[in-house]
């Protein structure tokens, strides 16, 4: 994992995997690194263990999106690990912890928009209120500023 910033991903007190992101862009090195590399993320919302006493969460695609949102003060933000990884199991986890309202803040690209619509439909099936937060082009939750976040999440 040399050359990577590594983040251990826990859920329910158990280490599920380690995710790394390259500190530099090298053509011979993948940008992201996950060990074990065959880990199934369909049942992981991170950091679910740390989101407590709230019925409202913000869903973002990646760990670095989540870290930025937490740094901005939004400690109810959960990472879903990509646009294709919001599953029925994750929906059940949100239901289990009592979530009744969700803001979906995915990247403003075709994949993010399509996934946000899918997540909204899944949440609707459980009567969980949701809204899609439309980010300006070129801005994802990983680089969002405090002022812009406050304006978008009103």
Q: What function would you assign to each model-found segment?
A:
Residues 1-98, 116:
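Phosphate-handling DNA/RNA-contact segment within nucleic-acid enzymes
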Residues 1-5, 139-154:
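Short, small/acidic-rich helices and loops at N termini and domain boundaries
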Residues 59, 100-111, 133-134:
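Acidic beta-strand-to-loop metal/phosphate-binding motif
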Residues 81-86, 107-109, 136:
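Short, acidic/turn-prone active-site loops that include or flank metal/cofactor-
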Residues 92, 110-121:
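Mg2+-dependent endonuclease catalytic cores in nucleic-acid-processing enzymes, primarily RNase H-like
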Residues 97-108, 147-154:
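A polyampholytic, Gly/Pro-enriched intrinsically disordered region
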Residues 123-130:
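Short acidic, glycine/proline-enriched helix-loop-strand junctions
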Residues 130-138:
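A generic structural motif
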